[in-house]
Curated annotation (Swiss-Prot):
Modified residues (Phosphoserine): S93
Pfam families associated with the record: Acylphosphatase
Species name: Sus scrofa
Record's function text: Its physiological role is not yet clear.
The protein's name: Acylphosphatase-2
Database matches in SUPFAM superfamilies: Acylphosphatase/BLUF domain-like (SSF54975)
Keyword check for Lipid biosynthesis: no
Catalytic residues of the enzyme: R24, N42
Keywords, comma-separated and alphabetical: Acetylation, Hydrolase, Phosphoprotein
GO molecular function: acylphosphatase activity
Length: 99
C-alpha cells in the first residue's frame, strides 16, 4: 500500500472586481481541471468566498489561481486564505457553485 499524499483544506475570500465577471464559473472549471473539490459563491458584500480541498500541491495550484488569475474580466485586489489544515478525507465529491 502506497503512502497517501496529505490532503489539505482551505477557505478563501477573493476581493476586487469578482462579481458579474463569470468568476464562479471559471473557478469551478479551474478546480475541475486541477482536480480539487469544494465550492464557490458570491457574498452580499461583493466578494467571492469558498473552500478548496485536495492533495496539497493541487490546493496550492488553486490558491495561486485564486490569487493571481481568476476569470478573464476579473480584477483580483487580494485573496485571503484561512482555516488551512490537513484533513483525513475529502468532505466533497466535486466542486460546485453555491447560491
Amino acid at each position: 500500500m502506497s503512502t497517501a499524499r496529505p490532503l489539505k483544506s482551505v477557505d478563501y475570500e477573493v476581493f476586487g472586481r469578482v462579481q458579474g465577471v463569470c468568476f464562479r464559473m471559471y473557478t469551478e472549471d479551474e478546480a475541475r481541471k486541477i482536480g480539487v473539490v469544494g465550492w464557490v459563491k458570491n457574498t452580499s458584500k461583493g466578494t467571492v468566498t469558498g473552500q478548496v480541498q485536495g492533495p496539497e500541491e493541487k490546493v496550492n495550484s488553486m490558491k495561486s489561481w485564486l490569487s493571481k488569475i481568476g476569470s478573464p474580466s476579473s480584477r483580483i485586489d487580494r485573496t485571503n486564505f484561512s482555516n488551512e489544515k490537513t484533513i483525513s478525507k475529502l468532505e466533497y465529491s466535486n466542486f460546485s457553485i453555491r447560491y
